[in-house]
């Protein structure tokens, strides 16, 4: 799986590396309106004390196209998975090289894509925190608030709405 496709898929779904690596056709569900969803139990990591939970993610066109692109990939067919992912350590190594080349000071890892989904893709587009929490498979919105960075643009927009309502 090209690194670009992997990172793009994660940015548009919010799935963690372990969830993408174990994603199978059974996790793809079409609703009665014809829309596709990922419904997946999150991988429980005993050593990190993560609780099991369910991610319920409506799929946008970009991740759908990526899934379709790899549907007949030999590795996917052989392993029964949706995407032919490399190991997380190798992917993070590539991301570090890219960040260094671009002069990005942030520690760029696969988990940054999950944060991108939680902030830029969802919250910045006015998706309610509770809905983002369900898509990320969090047990509570308290966990999601860790991902939710308040953006000045959303604060300004909110206050402009208040200002309009209060004007006489």
Task: Annotate the PLM regions.
Residues 1-17, 21, 125:
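Basic, Lys/Arg- and aromatic-enriched nucleic-acid-binding interface segment
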Residues 22-68:
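Conserved tyrosine-mediated DNA breakage-rejoining catalytic core shared by Y-recombinases
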């Amino acid at each position: 799986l090209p690194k670009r496709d992997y990172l793009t898929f994660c940015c548009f779904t919010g799935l963690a590396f372990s969830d993408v690596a174990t994603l199978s056709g059974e996790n793809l569900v079409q609703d009665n309106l014809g829309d596709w969803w990922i419904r997946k139990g999150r991988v429980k990591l005993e050593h990190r004390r993560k609780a099991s939970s369910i991610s319920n993610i409506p799929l946008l066109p970009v991740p759908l196209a990526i899934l379709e692109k790899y549907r007949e990939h030999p590795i996917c067919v052989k392993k029964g998975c949706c995407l032919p992912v490399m190991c997380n350590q190798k992917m993070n190594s590539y991301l570090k090289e890219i960040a260094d080349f671009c002069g990005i000071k942030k520690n760029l890892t696969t988990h940054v894509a999950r944060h991108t989904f939680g902030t830029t893709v969802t919250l910045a587009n006015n998706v309610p925190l509770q809905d983002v929490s369900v898509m990320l498979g969090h047990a509570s919105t308290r966990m999601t608030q860790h991902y939710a960075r308040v953006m000045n643009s959303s604060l300004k927009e909110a206050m402009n709405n208040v200002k309009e309502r209060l004007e006489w």
